[in-house]
Amino acid sequence: MEKTKYLIIGNGIAGLAAAREIRANDEKGIIIMISSESTLTYYRVKLTEYMSKEFTDEELLVSKENWYKDKNIKVILRKVVEDIDITNNKVRLDDGQEIGYEKLLIATGSRPFIPPINGKYKEGLFALRTLKDLHYIKEYLKSCNDVSLIGGGLLGLEAAWALKELDKEVSIIEFAPYLLPRQLDKEISDKLEKKLSEHGFKIYLSSQAEEILGDGVVTGIKLNGERKIESDGILVSSGIRPNLDLVRYTEIECNRGVIVDKHLKTNIANIYAAGDVVEIDGMVLGLWTAGNEQGKVAGANMTGKELEYNQPKIFTTLKMGSIELFSAGIIDDFDRVHEYKDDERDIHHKLFTRDNKIVGAILFGDLKEMNTIRNAVISNTSIDEYIKKDSRFK
């Protein structure tokens, strides 16, 4: 049986960040990463962008193959970990191979959530989560003219824009009463909707896909209210669910995700978890930046450190052609809103305050002050102090 000091299951950004941090703190300890995918860690957050671009797989890699060799990190690809033997500190792969470990990191990531829609298994309905998905979707789209997007969140809109760049007719179906409900208030979301409509997008709000139409192959969608949309391709962007199959029937505690403490430790002494698979403080974030930071903390702690992970404030940037958006912090629990508007230039900025401190912001158009405002949200700057430097806000 092969043995290693550090075993990482998964090679997403959390797994890679952990491996980097382990090697920074332990130059000699053996590190093995195992992944069911056929590619080294890549920029998953760029997949939607590359729907409308020609590229090589290597362009998407976070670190090239030579980096792993230089750092003496062994990566096992195209293998699935089928079982964790917590008592004997070993895992079993789908080919029967066993690997023993001293410290284990679970970084198995997440999978797309496909809502329970009648006919959802028809050819032509897909979700974009992996590089393999991207290659399949790009090929399938070559024969599509009308494509529908189920989900009007951030990733959904980015995908919709990529589809428009491929000269597709694009419909966006959103269950909520307005787009980006987590990042925007209704007033600014309405402005975004207007802009998207001007670019030719068809938008269906407060809408739910009830049935995928077609005889084995997608031809359309039936919405609530008996409305129908013709579609020869459907991309679902309805969120994620942690990959818990490996740990579900072990002693590792899990709920919506693998439950960890502020050190990214599970309830089992030598087992850690990080990334999309993790639940911390009752939350599953599913964010690239969070996965990166969690991986760093977990990796360092696997070498004996006692670092703490702090939940980040959420920042969102969306740039699609002439459309520019930035959202930061808390926008749904505040005392007052301070605004700056320039209708001629189509700019609308809002600062949300609580107890006279800036707790959140939304910028629509002109993002030059984005970093300044981001820092003000992070530090909860006094609105009075901020206005002294930026008198646009009232």
What are the functions of these language-model segments?
Residues 221, 227-253, 324-394:
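C-terminal catalytic lobe of FAD-dependent flavoproteins
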Residues 2-5, 11, 24, 277-371:
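Mid-to-C-terminal Rossmann-like scaffold of FAD/NAD(P)H-dependent oxidoreductases
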Residues 1-7, 61-148, 221-226, 233-238, ...:
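FAD-binding core/adjacent interface of flavoenzyme oxidoreductases
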Residues 28, 75-93, 99, 166-262:
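A Rossmann-like FAD-binding core segment of flavoenzymes
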Residues 10-13, 129, 150-153:
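Glycine-rich Rossmann-fold phosphate-binding loop(s) that bind the pyrophosphate
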Residues 136-184, 218:
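Rossmann-like NAD(P)H-binding beta-loop-alpha module
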Residues 2-74, 160-183:
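Beta1-alpha1 glycine-rich phosphate/pyrophosphate-binding loop at the start
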Residues 121-142, 213-222, 227-300:
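FAD-site-proximal beta/loop scaffold in flavoenzymes
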